[in-house]
Amino acid sequence: PTTGSVEATLEETYFNRTPDHFCSHQHTPNNPGADRAGAVLTKNTGYIVWNVFHDYADKGSYHLKELVLHMIDNLLGDDRSVKVNLPDRGIVTFTKQEDESRYIAHLLFAHTSKRGANIEVIEDIIPLCEIKLDARLPKAPKRVYKAECEDGKIVTTDLDYKFENGVASVDVGKVTMHAMVVFDI
């Protein structure tokens, strides 16, 4: 029994396959009624009872990624510092530069191609369009702009934003591999 919300269950098999216990299928059928909590959420904790990150790295099962994201989203609720609609290979880092009175969101996306066992290379730069960013800030920014490198020079573009309930919402537009969104406070 658990006091939290069960987000996923583990279903036990009738038996484990061994030379003595054989099943003609790759997996032995599940034993109805022999299930148990596999992922549990409480108000401030989340627990997954198996090595989900190893399993995801090994097998790449989409449902494992979705389970982890679901649990993180539920734990963070409205308290997340940043949210962006980058695709799954996208990376966002959100930093505070106190001396400059600003926050910076670095948006990064590169489509990689696998070459060999453990090598991923970037061969094509694919721009992303209609990128949207929400950033939690202590107060409304004085200015929001995108900073990008073009031909070795930093180019800035002012961005319109909406500030409600401590969150600045920005339509970043196009991102080609990397862009910085700067929030001057």
Question: Can you say where each PLM-predicted feature lies in the sequence?
Answer:
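A conserved amphipathic helix/loop scaffold
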Residues: 1-174, 179-181, 185
